[in-house]
């Protein structure tokens, strides 16, 4: 890096929130907190056993709001980057928590949904929802008697705000991936899209991802250590411009 950046796109995955105590989906055995993905993260699972699915996300929602779950140094550094950079910072996250927002980031795209929101199964109306969702709980905002569900993108469903994401990737002059495995598409392909439009690319991870060869620069270690260091470097270049 030797010149200031004006359009930075940051992709974050489970690795950035793991340091804050958020348990992650284990792709190698298809389990999420000892539940089969087919049972708790698919439309079919919800149709088959809505009580199980609601209970699963209710527990995750309660955990997220526990006072012990806080944004870590990586989240805070990205919030500082957005506040201080003479340019635009877009955070695209695969995570369903609100730690980026609590860390100070405002321009956040949740491509997999948000745990603290609920959605009407019929109208797709989305509302803020910090309490448990009960089976049989109807939509509060429309007249259609339809079950409320977590505002989460399940396997087999379309990711959210993809048009905005690809527009941001086209404009990016720096693309940073933090805490991602590089095995879940379309997110795993974002580095290639950004490179095609001329962005410098950096990977920050505990270990090389499945797409590490796409990155021009690699930094391996804890996100809470590596992200603040990178942000300091970017802002130092910015002040010299």
From Swiss-Prot:
Organism: Vibrio parahaemolyticus serotype O3:K6 (strain RIMD 2210633)
Sites where the protein binds substrate: 57, 60
Active-site residue list: 112 (proton acceptor)
Top enzyme class: transferase
TM ranges: none
Co-factor remark: Binds 1 zinc ion per subunit.
EC id: 2.3.1.286
Induction or repression: Is overexpressed during infection.
Domain remarks in the Swiss-Prot or TrEMBL record: The NAD(+) binding region 13-32 is crucial for deacetylase activity. 2 residues (Tyr-57 and Arg-60) present in a large hydrophobic pocket are probably involved in substrate specificity. They are important for desuccinylation activity, but dispensable for deacetylation activity.
Residues reported to bind NAD(+): 13-32, 94-97, 179-181, 205-207, 223
Pfam families: SIR2 (PF02146)
Function: NAD-dependent lysine deacetylase and desuccinylase that specifically removes acetyl and succinyl groups on target proteins. Modulates the activities of several proteins which are inactive in their acylated form. In the intracellular pathogen V.parahaemolyticus, this enzyme regulates host response during infection by induction of host histone deacetylation; it specifically causes deacetylation of histone lysine residues H3K56, H3K9, H3K18 and H4K16 which results in transcriptional repression of several host genes involved in epigenetic regulation, immune response, and autophagy.
Annotated GO CC locations: cytoplasm; host cell cytosol; host cell nucleus
Swiss-Prot/TrEMBL keywords: Cytoplasm, Host cytoplasm, Host nucleus, Metal-binding, NAD, Transferase, Zinc
Quaternary data: Monomer.
The name this protein goes by in its record: NAD-dependent protein deacylase
